[in-house]
Amino acid sequence: LKQKSLDLQIREAYLEGLSALEEGDVLFAARKFNEVELLYPQSDLAPKSSLMAAYSYYVQDYYEDCIMELDRFLKVYPKDKNLDYANYMLGIAFYEQIVDEKKDTFSIIKAKGYFEYLIQNYPNTEYAVDASFKLELIKDVLASKELYIGRYYVDKKKWIPAINRFKNVVNKYDTTIYIEEALYRLVEIHYLLGLKEEAKK
């Protein structure tokens, strides 16, 4: 009877969180989900509550809180069945913070890392398609940045750093729209330097 009463308390607290989330009171929802996990850590709903708390923060654009919650989830529940979702949401939380691709390098790299990890380790997850799509967008951003810096070095006649930047596009981002310009620039520089054999490659 006592166990039944405890199970009921856990479920009621969880449902309160869901109800608050549906009504838009996301901070209260996050608090209720955290409460379930804190007071009933052995409950089957504990890991799910942690994920729901993270989602509540995400909905409100509290990305740092969302990331902290998800990081903790991965440490506390390393064998949970929803690890794919946690890694996907980490990628999304960083992805949503990319406002200026020239400045938000940290968020770009972190999002890229989580999406790549998800696709590599959970290729059949339902989140893989969206992760792949966003990964291609991120690669476009990174390739664009490499090309921009490469052009800067060309203008300054700093050929070796320019070559390195264009090679980065060719080696790392060959599926992006910037591959053709990168190849053209490499050929152009090699001809300028008299390296015709290199240009032919």
Please name every model-derived segment:
Residues 1-201:
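Acidic, polar-rich low-complexity tracts and alpha-helical solenoid repeat scaffolds
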